[in-house]
Amino acid sequence: MAEAILAVRGGLGAKSRLAAVFSDAERAALVEAMLLDMLDALAGAGAGAVRRVWVVTPTERLERLAAAAGARVIREPRPAGLNAAFRCGLAAAAEEAPYADIVLLPGDLPTLRAQDVDAALLLLRTHDLVLALASRDGGTGLLAVRAGVPFTPQFGAQSCARHRRQARARGLSCALVEAGSLALDLDRPEDAVEVARGPCGRRTAEVLSDLKSRWRAQ
């Protein structure tokens, strides 16, 4: 069974690249909606696939929401970036489940589907590392690591290539999982339009409903 770690930052300053589309309050609500939709998706993963979900966040409200949804929460004292958040989550998970597989997910995948997580974990049975390529910037939508395999998260733009280089340097077998729900992170206005056009989590769809109206009016 795997330990899933989500890293997410909320509050009024979250998702600043969406400021042209959403107000501060709307962006904060969007982050909350995406987190809860992702937790729902992970809860629907195949029997025994995900043992526990950890949420790493510096945001008090997200801490409360994640805990109420049944996640284990690690509260960061201050925002320190995505990779620092994942390192924090990895350390905590290693203490409680040192022999578990690990799945790292940024908290902005509003179309996440349980079956795509299952597909990644199925590949992990025969590989040391599984990656999902983000569609727009070459980033990483998912990073899954087999139990006991040493690996350092390097999320960010073009990070999928960095992760693959690190795997080669360490002599690790690596597979790519092709899944649309792991490729679309909602970070820019054009991402919001794409998510609004298709199926996504219920809460995210509600927050995006106003954007849909604006888009149709154009």
Curated annotation (Swiss-Prot):
Disulphide-bridged cysteine pairs: none
Assigned EC number: 2.7.7.106
GO BP term, pick one: F420-0 metabolic process
InterPro entries registered for this protein in UniProt: CofC, Nucleotide-diphossugar_trans
Keyword terms of this UniProt record: GTP-binding, Nucleotide-binding, Nucleotidyltransferase, Transferase
A single MF term (Gene Ontology): GTP binding
Pathway assigned in UniProt: Cofactor biosynthesis; coenzyme F420 biosynthesis
Catalytic activity: (2R)-3-phosphoglycerate + GTP + H(+) = 3-[(R)-glyceryl]-diphospho-5'-guanosine + diphosphate
Function per UniProt: Guanylyltransferase that catalyzes the activation of (2R)-3-phosphoglycerate (3PG) as 3-[(R)-glyceryl]-diphospho-5'-guanosine, via the condensation of 3PG with GTP. It is involved in the biosynthesis of a derivative of the hydride carrier cofactor coenzyme F420, 3PG-F420.
HAMAP family documented for this protein: CofC
Family membership noted in the UniProt record: Belongs to the CofC family.
Protein name in UniProt: 3-phospho-D-glycerate guanylyltransferase
Higher taxonomy: Bacteria, Pseudomonadati, Pseudomonadota, Alphaproteobacteria, Caulobacterales
